[in-house]
């Protein structure tokens, strides 16, 4: 999932190491293309271009999961590595497991350098980030047990190049 060059770089590294056959970068701004992506990643081999899909449909974590499921189904995969920031992983995992309960989801957390992991409560920015993410996580958990849907998502275009 997008949200920082560290996440994308980690995902590309997994692809380079052969730990994934293909890569979907979900939630990419519509202005971002392969050329701009290559400029932001150090040592991005051109031959990886055919293995990377830029998903321009998703606008939130739930939609990232839906876009990823559509891409997984289209490619015939039953498992994925979920690469996102460590603080975002619990909510992401919850959404992904809800959308694709039969898929094997391997979490691969990234630890952004800008987020203070030790004594995070002493850093106002990190405190706000962690508490906000926790509140969103609680909302997601509740949404999975309550009988309503808040997503209007075009599954037809999800996860396509």
Task: Kindly give the residue locations of the regions a language model identified.
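A structural signal for short, hydrophobic/glycine-enriched beta-strand patches
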Residues: 1-124
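A transmembrane-helix-recognition feature enriched in membrane-embedded lipid enzymes
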Residues: 123-153
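Hinge/cleft segment of the Venus flytrap/periplasmic-binding protein
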Residues: 151-161
